[in-house]
Amino acid sequence: MTDTFSDYADCTPLLDDREALDRFYDEHGYVYLRGVLDRELVRTTAEQMLQGLIALGHAAPGTTLDTLTIESYEAVDEVAMHDHVRYDDLWNHPSTLKVWEKVFGEPVFVFKSTTIRYYPSAPDSAEPSFLTPLHQDGFYIGPNKDFRTAWIPLLPTTRGTGGVAIADGSHKKGPREHVLTENFRRFGHAVRGIPPAEFGADEELLFSPMEPGDVLLFHAFMCHKSLPNVSVDPAGMRMSMDTRIQPASSHRGFNALTPWPESAKDASKGIMSKITGTPTTAE
């Protein structure tokens, strides 16, 4: 597998064709929808994130989304930032729930746990340690695996600002081995990822620039990773957030019921323990 990217396929025209939408998802493991979320709701969430960065002293008063830049993602208190972003208002807004239910074809439950991201441009560091290596969310989250990850940009993304890359159809091979990758760390702990040797030449990486209002949903066993923000001329912030969604009738595990700040506040735990709620001897 090489880091060359083809575009996501736009699935928006399939939203009203249940059979075609399910067929595409079963084959490719993702659904990319353009402009389906209320842009004003997304903008409000972006403004809340901006105000959080200002309140915590990482951006000057009067900074706008167009002028925002911060020195470091890692310097921001991630738990404190969650007090400023009312993401559940977006995830569970009636207009948003209609989108989720159209994708699933049934009533849904949106996880209480949300991840928020505010990455400044770092063109001299191609892979900052806080980025995630190739992995499957289903390795961490359970016990049921019928959830889908929903990833949205709060500001426009470009090939420079990066985003999330997915390996087309990789979900069909099921769960894969994840090994510790010392060059990727979260909360001071090494993060597990999938060895590159695990991938076949047919598992093409996909990435497309996205606009606020777009959403990418993918399978629990979709192999994916974060791409760095290396934007220049202009350098831009990447602001995004993601959660998981599952059928309302399914079992609800620890990550589904526990807000991220509750699981993240224990500094002694690495990412595996935080997501599962179960202490582990090795992350």
Curated annotation (Swiss-Prot):
Substrate binds at residues 117, 186. It catalyses: 1-deoxypentalenate + 2-oxoglutarate + O2 = 1-deoxy-11beta-hydroxypentalenate + succinate + CO2. Residues 251-283 are annotated as: Disordered. Fe cation binds at residues 135, 137, 224. It comes from the Bacteria. SUPFAM superfamilies: Clavaminate synthase-like. One of its GO terms (molecular function) is 2-oxoglutarate-dependent dioxygenase activity. Pathway: Antibiotic biosynthesis; pentalenolactone biosynthesis. GO terms for biological process: antibiotic biosynthetic process. Keywords: Antibiotic biosynthesis, Dioxygenase, Iron, Metal-binding, Oxidoreductase, Vitamin C. Pfam families: PhyH. Its EC number is 1.14.11.35. Its cofactor is Fe cation; L-ascorbate. 2-oxoglutarate binds at residues 135-137, 151, 226, 238. InterPro entries: DxPntBtaHylase, Phytyl_CoA_dOase-like. Belongs to the PhyH family. PANTHER family: ECTOINE DIOXYGENASE, PHYTANOYL-COA DIOXYGENASE DOMAIN CONTAINING 1. Catalyzes the conversion of 1-deoxypentalenic acid to 11-beta-hydroxy-1-deoxypentalenic acid in the biosynthesis of pentalenolactone antibiotic. This is 1-deoxypentalenic acid 11-beta-hydroxylase. The lineage of its organism: Bacteria, Bacillati, Actinomycetota, Actinomycetes, Kitasatosporales.
